[in-house]
Amino acid sequence: VYATIRGYGDYRTGKGPYNDWPAFDIVAQAMGGFMAMTGEKDSPTKAGPGIGDIVPGIMCAFGVIAALRKAEQTGQGEFVDVSMYDAMIAFCERQIYRYSFVEDVSHGEGNDHPLVNPFSIYRAADGWYAIGCALESQWQALIKIMGLDELKDDNRLNSNDARIKNAEFVRKTITEWTRLHTKAQLMNKLAGKVPSGPANNVEDIYKDEHLKVRDMLQDIDVPGLGKKKIAGVPVKFLRNPGSVKSPGPQLGFHTKEVMEQFGIKNMKDD
């Protein structure tokens, strides 16, 4: 079983006009429609993390695992091909079906959701706070916590469709409450009742006790630099917990070992 990740795929799995073109993360994000869905209207916006690289890698890993399982059953090998462009199309699948069903063309959703409201970030006293109410019961819980029970029967807000039509009023109503509280206060008030959480920066992440318990900030020894923290392993196994044991090898670290496999020995250090 072997695999490739290319910008636009291998000829063997689908020959198109782009197969030989080079690509990077930003190109995959742009062509796959991700940037059109992100940011404000008519202002395509790139994601901070390199998802145009990361998503194809994750999909390729799943493909290799599936191919290995098939090889165990049949004794036959397989070639796994992942296109960065294809991966971003699959990642942004909502735009595909919405265009087919209702001819909707995404022009930047900002921090809102086109089908659910409220589902955004709101100004807090010391930053921003995310709130998402996908269920009516969650909306009812939110207005109760805000002390606005009278909104339960307000025709502008008594259904998800109504809230989508009156999105600006919803935002104004929620923001008038959230901006009176810090992110920590909002967490205490909403925790376990309404899906919500602070818009963290990396300093906030380093202080989060939950991540420490989850072992998501792991220490590794970096040659010449000592102990440094990196992101931990998000896939947890109960019987065989995993961790990051060491940093990635430096350039040329395995050159001697690889060359010796081909019978080339007594190599100079350079």
Predicted segments with their positions:
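Active-site-adjacent "lid/gating" segments in soluble enzymes
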Residues: V1-Y129, C133-A134, A141
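A glycine-rich dinucleotide-binding beta-alpha-beta segment and adjacent secondary-structure elements
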Residues: A191-G242
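A structural signal for well-ordered alpha-helical segments within the folded catalytic domains
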Residues: V55-F62, E136-Q140, E168, A184, ...
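Flexible, small-/acidic-enriched active-site or ligand-binding loops
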Residues: D221-D269
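Active-site rim elements
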Residues: I51, Y129, I174-E176, S243-S246
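Aromatic-enriched alpha-helical interface/lid elements that frame and gate functional surfaces
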Residues: N117-S196
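Short linear loop/turn motifs
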Residues: D153-K165, N200-E209, M267-D270
